[in-house]
UniProtKB/Swiss-Prot annotation:
It comes from the Bacteria. The gene is mnmC. This is tRNA 5-methylaminomethyl-2-thiouridine biosynthesis bifunctional protein MnmC. SUPFAM superfamilies: FAD/NAD(P)-binding domain. The keyword DNA damage does not apply. Its cofactor is FAD.
Length: 699
């Protein structure tokens, strides 16, 4: 059973407010939109005629009512049917976040899609992707990765400053919508220039002369167009003449170097993946599966080495796992990352499920994913936890699509069993079967690229020479590979190159409970002291224990009792708790790897020995503390070249894993990232050491 609360009442903005924030552009007719699309495509001619360009990146300044965006996506999809186009990444920078409910309201009330009915399927796809009113980048992926949309919501200056520059695939073109053109300050334009190709086009709708002049001082050659021009028939004669200024281009280069130097302590890959050479991955769980999928969407081949006989036999092997964001009272980088990641994972589940339903299981080749977006209801279980939850609820004006407070009566209606206490409800959350989720990702990856899986292949050692990385099992040697990713969960620290990573194993036992009596009515995931899922195939999942550095992975009767005790403590005097029967001793035990700061690890593998060697060298002269901090800030941190880490997903891997994998895939192929610099710094596997060194503290 699924909880289906009516949440539209939680949204606060009505249509007059929305149309004021997201106004319709002067380009209203289909003829004008077609001409604008032709002009934008015409300006990309130089890029599209290059030998096999893999990706075209385009920026849009402002969302407006979204019609220009929908129209260009449709135009690109139509062209792609007859032309060999590269993949498309559209990055929309918008200061006012908007959610899927408001987008639908905006499009319905304005009747925009009635005037342009061919755009309805794209609009539906965006609405189904459930964008939220949150700060940061939300990546939406369509057409098996052929088209991606980054919704970069938040303060425009901050968003641009924190965007990493992508050398291989910079922004090739900007479309400036008129309602946000007045915000194009010199500082903002220089940041746009930093992120752009040196010959990027700068197209504005009725740009003011002052804005055009400002853009020119930052190295752009602005092309301003009017509604009258787009209504005419001479669109092919309009051309954007790129006038390059060596001094201004040098200023851009210096700005990029300055930004990169400022973030040098978070290293990025020194070499770009080649589609002709596979990337090696050691793993077999959710992280490695989604890395393979994200790479495959980029036509990048990969080879998985898995010690088990199938996917999802480690921490990803549970029958059900909850998916919802981790929120903090401060809504800091951790909280914002988990909101972005949770929504991305939710979209992955929906897309893979749709792929599995397009035909029979055999015909589609994608495993169906058992899941239910039934929501997650979080409640306190003692005075301290209740205070903590209240602080989270009251400290931020959370978007209703992320979470909202409910009273005891509403909690009972959502759960469809007795809760009798207030809580925090995550309406887009739910549960998913982790191992099916992993298998579906690899199934889809195999349709898009050359993907190989070597099962029953335990890699016992890795080594590197001038040609690359080699993987050694008991009887074979694989390689060389230019790039190797360690995504092997509980075995992440088994190699000499990764043994000093600051990450800890925690045993978790999940109890399997038969669905019966009142308990069978549970319609949402409960999260208190432990969690309880709705029934799936006649069983509920109850868990989980949390034991550091456990000596074994055998069934533990005491942990089974502790799981029951957590529900008894969380919901005392509720009759349905008596329906929880653990007597069958049915459970599953796994190990999740946890970091102290709860962020996953994603990025270049740190050379910890070299970090310590440099640290000890600098310790000799403590009088130069400021210079030492500057050294660690601006000097690329030591890494094992070509080796990468993807792990430490902890208890929230279903939420965090797919986005971490997407980000690593973008790094490996040098494509624009869906995360900003502050978040990348938090994810870096070297962060525990560099955090101290940047503050001048002892290791």
């Amino acid at each position: 059973m699924t909880a289906k609360p009516h949440i539209s009442c939680q949204f606060k903005r009505d249509y007059p407010q929305l149309i004021n924030l997201y106004p319709t552009c002067t380009i209203a007719t289909q003829h004008s939109l077609d001409n604008l699309n032709r002009l934008r495509h015409q300006c990309l001619t130089a890029l599209l005629t290059q030998p096999s360009p893999h990706l075209c990146v385009m920026g849009q300044w402002g969302l407006g009512d979204g019609i220009e965006l929908l129209s260009f996506i449709h135009y690109w999809q139509t062209l792609a049917k007859t032309q060999n186009l590269p993949r498309l990444l559209l990055k929309v920078f918008e200061p006012n976040p908007i959610n899927y409910y408001e987008l639908k309201l905006l499009w319905d009330q304005s009747q925009s899609l009635i005037l342009h009915p061919h755009l309805q399927p794209i609009a539906n796809a965006i609405i189904e992707a459930k964008p939220a009113r949150i700060i940061g980048c939300q990546r939406l992926i369509f057409d098996d990765g052929r088209i991606s949309l980054d919704l970069d919501f938040g303060d425009l200056q901050t968003m641009l400053v924190n965007q990493p520059h992508c050398g291989t695939y910079p922004i090739q073109q900007w479309l400036i919508l008129p309602h946000l053109a007045p915000q194009l300050s010199r500082k903002i334009l220089w940041q746009m220039a930093r992120l752009s190709a040196d010959d990027a086009h700068f197209i504005g709708v009725e740009l003011a002369e002052t804005t055009q002049n400002l853009a020119k001082t930052c190295g752009f050659s602005p092309l301003t167009i009017t509604a009258d021009m787009l209504c005419g028939e001479q669109i092919d004669s309009i051309a954007s003449q790129i006038v390059t200024d060596d001094i201004l281009l040098h200023e851009r280069k210096l700005l990029r170097q300055q930004a990169n130097n400022h973030q040098a302590f978070t290293p990025r890959p020194s070499q770009v993946a080649s589609t002709k050479q596979p990337i090696a991955i050691i793993g077999g769980g959710l992280a490695s599966a989604h890395l393979m999928l994200s790479l495959a969407e980029r036509e990048q081949s990969s080879i998985l080495f898995c010690k088990d006989n199938d996917l999802g036999q480690g921490a990803s092997g549970n029958r059900q796992g909850a998916i919802y964001p981790l929120l903090t009272p401060e809504n800091d980088e951790l909280s914002r990352f988990f909101q972005q990641a949770f929504l991305f994972s939710r979209r992955r589940i929906a897309a893979l499920s749709l792929a599995s339903m397009k035909g029979s299981d055999v015909a589609s080749g994608v495993m169906p994913i058992s899941h239910d977006f039934c929501g997650v209801l979080q409640t306190g279980h003692d005075e301290r936890s209740q205070q903590r939850l209240d602080k989270i609820i009251q400290s931020q004006d959370w978007p209703a699509e992320i979470a909202y407070a409910v009273d005891a009566s509403e909690a009972n209606k959502i759960a469809k069993i007795g809760i009798d206490k207030a809580g925090f409800y995550y309406p887009l959350g739910g549960w998913v079967c982790p191992f099916e989720y992993a298998k579906a990702a690899v199934d889809k990856a195999s349709q898009l690229a050359n993907v190989q899986c070597h099962f029953n292949t335990e890699i016992t050692e890795i080594e590197r020479d001038a040609k690359g990385w080699y993987l050694l099992s008991q009887d074979q040697r694989f390689g060389p590979f230019r790039q190797l990713v360690l995504a092997n969960g509980a075995q992440l620290t088994q190699f000499s190159a990764s043994e000093r990573l600051q990450i800890s194993p925690f045993r978790g036992q999940v109890s399997h409970i038969p669905s019966q009596f009142q308990l069978s009515q549970l319609a949402t995931v409960l999260c208190a002291n432990g969690y309880l899922t709705p029934s799936h195939q006649g069983l509920h999942c109850l868990g989980a224990s949390y034991v550091k550095a456990a000596e074994h992975l055998d069934f533990c009767p005491l942990e089974q009792l502790e799981n029951l005790g957590k529900m008894q403590q969380s919901y005392p005097n509720q009759d349905w708790v008596e329906d929880i029967d653990i007597s069958a001793n049915s459970a599953r035990v796994g190990v999740r790897m946890v970091t102290r700061d709860h962020f996953p690890m994603m990025g270049c593998a740190p050379d910890v020995n070299e970090i310590w060697a440099r640290y000890e060298q600098h310790q000799i002269n403590q009088q130069q503390a400021e210079q030492i901090r500057h050294y660690w800030q601006t000097t690329p941190a030591p890494i094992h070249d070509g080796l990468y880490i993807l792990g430490g997903l902890g208890s929230r891997g279903l939420s965090s894993g797919p986005l971490a994998a997407e980000c690593l895939a973008a790094q490996l192929t040098d494509e624009p990232l869906p995360l900003d610099w502050p978040t990348l710094n938090k994810l870096s596997p070297n962060r525990m050491w560099l955090r101290k060194l940047l503050k001048g503290k002892a290791l």
